[in-house]
Amino acid sequence: MSGHSKWHNIQGRKNAQDAKRGKVFQKLSREIYMAAKSGGPDPSGNPTLRMVMDKARAANMPKTNIERAIKKAEGNSDEHYDEITYEGYAPGGVAVLVEALTDNKNRTASDVRVAFTRNGGSLGATGSVAYMFDRKGYLVIDRSTTDADEDQVLLDVMDAGGDDLETSDDAFEIYTDPKQFTAVRDALEKAGYKLANAELTMIPQNTTPVPADKKEQFAHLIDALEDNDDVSNVYTAAADDDE
């Protein structure tokens, strides 16, 4: 791995999203609905639904909200959302991937384009930056929840079929082939680990430092994208400040 650790960034983003909790729950409800609609309402037989439900619980989404979204998918609702990925560059030439669930592709494309252009970025064509990222399974064990040391965790991760382990003061971060994600997650939970995070994500092959004079503009762009109701995930190739 490139050493591009995600957990610190995820924690920071989660804290920032606490003030936008209603919007976060709305987006998660949409993801749960689509996962249940396409793969069935039983998470034991629908790994995508289980993953999104885990994500919702990690965001402290109420159980009633989760159940409501699943029941809606089981009903006669003809509501449909298209999965769209947008690609572009942030200020400083940093690659950005934007994943959206939308019921109006024209509206979302326009909103995403405006977010880029108003904040010093540029929206690119399909394929312009996607090749710079790899799809990976990503799991996190909070070190405060386990007595296992790094050697033991590494052994368990390898036995489970994981690809890589990164260690920090507060977490073990595990990366897997996306096809092995469910098997690795289940094996680690069976081994007694409590997962603080478990999701499929996009990891940059290389990172780009954000120039000091572009950092504020870069932050505004990411905020504008994440504030969009249709945007599910934003991935960047920005280097951490300590890289």
Swiss-Prot record:
GO terms for cellular component: cytosol. The keyword Cytoplasm applies. The keyword Lyase does not apply. Residues 1-22 are annotated as: Disordered. Belongs to the TACO1 family. It is found in: Cytoplasm. Keywords: Cytoplasm, DNA-binding, Transcription, Transcription regulation. One of its GO terms (biological process) is regulation of DNA-templated transcription. This is Probable transcriptional regulatory protein LJ_0904. GO terms for molecular function: DNA binding. It comes from Lactobacillus johnsonii (strain CNCM I-12250 / La1 / NCC 533). Pfam families: TACO1_YebC_N (PF20772), Transcrip_reg (PF01709). HAMAP family: Transcrip_reg_TACO1 (MF_00693).
